[in-house]
Amino acid sequence: MSGQPKRLMVMAGGTGGHVFPGLAVAHHLMAQGWQVRWLGTADRMEADLVPKHGIDIDFIRISGLRGKGVKALLAAPLRIFNAWRQARAIMKRFKPDVVLGMGGYVSGPGGLAAWSLGIPVVLHEQNGIAGLTNQWLAKIATTVMQAFPGAFPNAEVVGNPVRTDVLALPLPQVRLAGRDGPIRVLVVGGSQGARVLNQTMPQVAARLGDTVTIWHQSGKGVQHTVEQAYAGVGQPQHKVTEFIDDMAAAYAWADVVVCRSGALTVSEIAAAGLPAIFVPFQHKDRQQYWNALPLENAGAAKIFEQPQFTVEAVADTLAGWSREALLTMAERARAVSIPDATERVASEVSRVART
């Protein structure tokens, strides 16, 4: 490396599944002396979160096109052109050696702007099915990486960068050794919650009685309703919280997780080494199903598509897993994980910047 520090622009926005992996890579490279800036949108979570991590952020105006009316679709080319022009001006000022696209609407115009300026584009696809933006950008990218096999036919599988506190958890055989008593079930619907989990799990608790103890993240604004649902079936002892700030501590507590299967959730559960019941969000491209499938194939998880996520099916599944079976599943989950995903992505960014 020359005397001048290398410069990276991270393009990621919208959801934690895009932003948190980008932050992990950014911090890794900043620790090596890189200068990092972020490209995002002013009305999504990155606007608040990224500056809290000590990273400067620039904004462009762009939003998704899916589900919009005809008027919005007709205006889309002009909106994309304007966003491309904004991104291009930002990159001309910052002069990054490489840009890293981690997903979200911002990556499209940002990637095109970088390509038009001759700046190498590195892509990371977090999901088992590639999003539309990354499908387009892959044609102009210098390098494409994927978290799960199958999103792109020839891309290297590098996993998803996950938070260091999750990676620091003791291995399952250490963490779960000597545990007895009720099976500890962690229910996580994401920050928005998941209605199907909130409605079904209190009934599951009623069936399983004192063989389980549940910690249930309900999502915003429904904690009291979910608490009442548990109390209404004679199970008021279970813990319900709106959010869980320290997910690593929650994973450390749990014997099994019941949750959606967003890319980052699946990767964190594998890294922690936890068995899971996954309930994929119903989306036309079945993205969350494909995210969870490698863990089910490894014997570390069970997938219930939402129509099959019934009280009977879930209660029977949980009742059928002994502590020995759960430990075996936990070890299989950990074996599938790629704990050095952050280093792999950062290493590829560094390689591209040198060439």
From Swiss-Prot:
What's the catalysed reaction?
di-trans,octa-cis-undecaprenyl diphospho-N-acetyl-alpha-D-muramoyl-L-alanyl-D-glutamyl-meso-2,6-diaminopimeloyl-D-alanyl-D-alanine + UDP-N-acetyl-alpha-D-glucosamine = di-trans,octa-cis-undecaprenyl diphospho-[N-acetyl-alpha-D-glucosaminyl-(1->4)]-N-acetyl-alpha-D-muramoyl-L-alanyl-D-glutamyl-meso-2,6-diaminopimeloyl-D-alanyl-D-alanine + UDP + H(+)
Q: Which domain of life is it from?
A: Bacteria
Topology versus the membrane: Peripheral membrane protein
Its pathway is: Cell wall biogenesis; peptidoglycan biosynthesis
Q: Name one GO biological process term.
A: cell division
Amino acids binding UDP-N-acetyl-alpha-D-glucosamine? T15, G16, G17, N127, R163, S191, I244, A263, L264, T265, V266, S267, E268, Q288
Q: Which GO terms describe its cellular component?
A: plasma membrane
Cell compartments where the protein resides: Cell inner membrane
By its UniProt entry, which CDD domains does this protein fall under? GT28_MurG (cd03785)
Q: Which residues form the signal peptide?
A: none
Job of this protein:
Cell wall formation. Catalyzes the transfer of a GlcNAc subunit on undecaprenyl-pyrophosphoryl-MurNAc-pentapeptide (lipid intermediate I) to form undecaprenyl-pyrophosphoryl-MurNAc-(pentapeptide)GlcNAc (lipid intermediate II).
What protein family does this chain belong to? Answer: Belongs to the glycosyltransferase 28 family. MurG subfamily.
Name of the molecule in the record? UDP-N-acetylglucosamine--N-acetylmuramyl-(pentapeptide) pyrophosphoryl-undecaprenol N-acetylglucosamine transferase
Which species does this protein come from? Salmonella gallinarum (strain 287/91 / NCTC 13346)
State the organism's lineage: Bacteria, Pseudomonadati, Pseudomonadota, Gammaproteobacteria, Enterobacterales
Q: Which gene encodes it?
A: murG
